[in-house]
Amino acid sequence: MNVYRLASLGVWLLIGLVSTGCSGMPPLDQQKRLVQAGDFRIQQLTPPAFVETWGEPTYTHQQFTHFFGMPDGRLIPQARMALGESPQGWETGLAAGDAFFMAYADRGYYLVFLEGVLVYHEAMTAEKVHLVGKTWKFESQFKTRLESSPGMK
C-alpha cells in the first residue's frame, strides 16, 4: 500500500471515529455487527466499521463529488449515472463535497462516504470493482501535488 493511500485511509478512519463519538451514530461495535450482517444503513456506518470488519479495501479514492439526493436518504454519486441522466425517483435534492470511496473486489462492494458516513453502496462484480479501481488509478495520475496531499484542501 503506498504512503498516500495509507495516509488517506488513516485520515478517513480518524474522521469516522470522531464523527461516531460526536453524533447520534451507533457505536463502532454495533456498526461492525451491521456490516457483518450485510445491513448497510445509510448515514449510520463509517469507514472504520468496514475496515475493522472486512480489512483494507482493494481500492480507495477521494475526490470532490456531486450527488443526487434521494427521498430514502441515499446520495447517488453523479459519476454512477450516464451523462445527462438522473436516477429514477430523484426530484430536486442535490449535495456535493469531498467524498471518500472504498471498493472491495473480494466482497463485490463499492462504498461512498460523505462527511465520514456511508451515503451510497452498490454491489458489483469483482471485475467491475477492478475496472473502477483502474479508472481511479488513471485519474490520480493527473492530480496536482496539492490535490494529492492529505490535509491540503
Protein language model regions, located:
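C-terminal motif of bacterial Sec signal peptides marking the signal peptidase cleavage site
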Residues: V18-G21
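Bacterial N-terminal signal peptides that target proteins for export
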Residues: M1-V11
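Residues within mature, well-folded domains
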Residues: S23-K153
